[in-house]
């Protein structure tokens, strides 16, 4: 069975939907961890209620984005991560996470991507 780690910043409604879909076997995987960048996010309460481990980590506690993401990758190393789902994670993912989990990250995005200048989407982190 595949292991999913979900990243969220807010209410966690998408996180909860993913967990429930896994529990109902709609998705053949297990959510093994929630990574949350906001200590007051409602997603943390959802994780506790659903029995999912939560790793709360604030980028404000680090000197650089690299240091922040390196700490996350060190945490993830203790899991067999098959997929990272960015579900309401309100940060642009940097090179440290992208290179370590290349081809294993998907994003749910509330924006209409055509609203971004197509020639600049990758540069600004929209895709």
Where do the PLM segments sit?
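One-carbon transfer enzymes
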Residues: 1-127
